[in-house]
Design a protein with these regions (language model features):
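Short, solvent-exposed alpha-helical "recognition" segments
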Residues: 1-2, 32-54
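Structural motif
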Residues: 85-96
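Short alpha-helical "recognition helix" segments of helix-turn-helix
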Residues: 21-26
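Short secondary-structure subsegments characteristic of cysteine-rich extracellular domains
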Residues: 109-134
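Residue-level detection of the helix-turn-helix DNA-binding "recognition helix"
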Residues: 14, 27, 38-42
Length: 229
């Protein structure tokens, strides 16, 4: 029997150390350690500390596991999306929507929210088609937020954008109202800014993959034609 290790293990357990902490000092099997320490009772304070530490370690391990899964999933989506570009490359709607989102869409990776804002009705109509036909977003997943100036009729503007986007008002977030400037007072055709929102991280990553795939495709063609990239 490893008497020296046993004495040290008992001493550490009485100090409230966990089995994992003790095994780093007394290098014996978990079964042997359990046998040595089975009659040692911890104080309520020691039990609470070990319980809190265990929860923290488990939470950290779970967070790292989820992070790894998220990274792997993102890599897979990006890879698949980049491959899809070849089949979409001659589709005018795909290219127009991708370019518009690239220029005007939300690209923040903090919340990975798909968002496109514009005051031009034609651009909003095109992007609604793009999200529906290319991205396959079902109607019930769309959310709309309007930004208008206080002088104008909120209800009329909400109805206008609801009709244009074909999204029911029940899927509109609260309209954001700003003070009216002199410039907007003179504009009878003013309808504010419409923000299309889609809470879908996979779609956000897919669009990013399309952009990367498009760039790769362009660079390849430029090299084939001896053009500087």
């Amino acid at each position: 029997m490893k008497l020296k290790e046993k004495i040290e293990a008992i001493r550490l357990r009485k100090l409230g150390k966990s089995y994992g902490e003790i095994r780093k000092k007394a290098r014996v099997s978990k079964g042997t350690l359990s046998l040595w320490l089975r009659n040692i009772e911890l104080t309520p304070g020691q039990e609470k500390r070990l319980y809190v530490e265990l929860r923290q370690k488990n939470a950290y391990r779970m967070a790292k596991l989820n992070q790894r899964k998220r990274i792997d999933k993102t890599k897979k989506i990006l890879k698949e999306a980049k491959k899809e570009v070849s089949s979409y490359f001659t589709n005018p709607l795909f290219l127009a929507g991708l370019m518009l989102y690239w220029a005007e869409g939300d690209k923040s990776e903090e919340d990975e929210l798909v968002k496109f804002s514009n005051s031009d009705p034609a651009m909003i109509k095109l992007m609604m088609r793009w999200f529906g036909e290319i991205c396959k977003v079902p109607e019930e997943k769309f959310r709309i937020t309007l930004y208008i100036h206080e002088l104008f009729c909120r209800k009329d503007i909400e109805k206008y954008w609801s009709k244009l986007t074909k999204i029911p008002l029940a899927q509109f977030h609260k309209t954001q109202v700003k003070p009216t400037s002199l410039r907007h007072r003179k504009n009878p055709l003013y309808n504010g800014t419409c923000a299309i929102r889609i809470s879908n991280r996979d779609l956000f990553r897919r669009i990013k993959g399309w952009k990367l795939g498009f760039l790769e495709k362009i660079n390849i063609r430029m090299k084939e034609n001896n053009m500087p990239s």
